[in-house]
Amino acid sequence: MLTDELKSEIQVAYSQLLEAKGYVARHCQKQMIADVANTLGRIEVDEDGTRTSSHPVCVIEAGTGTGKTVAYAMAVLPIARAMGKSVVISTATIALQEQIVFVDLPDIREHSGVDFSYTLAKGRRRYLCLSRLDSLLQDVQSPNQSLAFYDDEMYQSDESYQALYELMLTKLGRGDWDGDRDNWSDEIANDAWFPVSTDHVQCTGRQCSHYENCYFYKAREQIHRVDCIVTNHDLVMSDLMMGGGAVLPEPEDTIYIFDEGHHLPDKAINHFASFLQIRSTQGWLEQIPGILHQLNEEFGNMGSLNIASFDDSVVNLMQRLEEVIILFEPLREFAEGNDTDMRYRFPGGQLELGHRDLARVLFQETGRLQGQLAILEDRLEEELEDESQKDSLEQWLPVVAGMNARAEACMNLWREMMLEDNVSEPPRARWVNFREGDELALHASPIAVHDSLQELLWSRCFGAIVTSATLAVGQDFSRFQRRTGIDAGNHFRALQSPFRYQDNAVLRVPHMSVDPRTADDHND
């Protein structure tokens, strides 16, 4: 409930900020503050503070010059504190993220009288992995290197980076660096950084011997101690797809602010899309038998590991993938693009029966392999309890976990390829890319994510604000509602820009002899 006390706090803070900065109040900014505050103030909760009412979302189109950051911060921060909720400000671009963290929030905290803490949340890949650094410094040919299997994760052991890794260790020891890639004194090349970072799949978490000193987990602890977290749409979507609360606070205890909110549907589509490169997949499948033989030799207690069963699964999958190439290759004739990347789109997103049947077989065969890898991953996690083998197992578990995740990703693609779309729902886009050489990449993607966003985000969050300069067509938000799944019963408003462009500028559209959609002709 928006009490008189909260209203007064917001008004006083806003007035103090304007006075301190020498700003003049803008009608559109004041309207935005009121809309956000009223939307959040209408949220009903039970005795545990859990939202019980519907329509907790406020969607505001506000043009350049409105002062959107000040508007939503002035309204949300006092209300969130009063309700005991966290605030997550999410942007689509690094530029706006840095503007908010390094300029806007410090200004607001200093001049408004609102006392709050904030931090910047980043993904795991932005932080150094101590386990991997330790491995690299001890032995350049550690399992994590020699057994990499993703194409974009393959790299050669390069002793020229050893000096960099030793300098990293020295700076960490002196407290001159916090393990954040962005805070290193120079730009770090990707092929130097990748070997000393990890992802959520290959991270062993609390079981890692370096857990207490892990820079990612230290940063995550900070996330749960502050009032306001600034991050990006991708990290929010990743957190939601992991169930919520994996990196960021639980959605039920969070008021989300999506700045540059027009990007949100496309970001969500990217997270729900699947793809698979045939030759690349064959490459990592071929490595599995050798990896497992090496694992079995290193750990005597893995004697019960059924290597033959893994070998059979790999052989079957390799054969099926060759069938994929034979079956899909004739489509190259109808593909569009350049010589190095041709694309064939399946009409209406629908595959022919033969393509779907093969995808169904591959889904089943990949599922068999994934099940075997999942059992092995669980086995290794159990063995981690044995301190005598902990160091070696910490090197092997990420490798097996990564293979398991890769198999799951392949299953997702084959599942999308084998299914027929429900005629009452938007179809999925499905296409194949013919790349240089004989590489063939299959893709499947939703064209609409409104139901997924409703399920993962809008139905769970305590409250949300979505804002951007481009959300509506005139005063009509219906297209944005369809794309995001935000129910029309929520609050929507398109604010007038404080800039009178119509009185100060003229838009001239030149006569052109070519269609702007034809890029080559248009550029000539």
Residue locations for each model-derived region?
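N-terminal pre-P-loop "Q-motif" helix
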Residues: Y23-D48
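Conserved beta-strand -> loop -> alpha-helix junction used to position metal-binding or nucleic-acid-contacting
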Residues: S86-A95, G113-L130, E252-H263, L276-I288, ...
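Walker A/P-loop
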Residues: V45-A75
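Signature of the SF2 helicase/ATPase Hel1-core->accessory helical subdomain module
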Residues: P78, A95-E98, V103-P106, H200-C228, ...
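A substrate-engagement module of RecA-like helicase motors
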Residues: L2-S15, V24-H27, D48-S54, T64, ...
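Hydrophobic "anchor" residues on beta-strands that sit immediately upstream
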Residues: V57, S86, C228, I255-Y256, ...
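Walker A/P-loop NTP-binding motif
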Residues: A37-G41, T69-M83, V103-D107
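A contiguous, basic/glycine-rich beta-loop/short-helix subdomain that forms a polymer-engagement track
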Residues: F194-I229, S238-V247, L376-S513, R517-D524
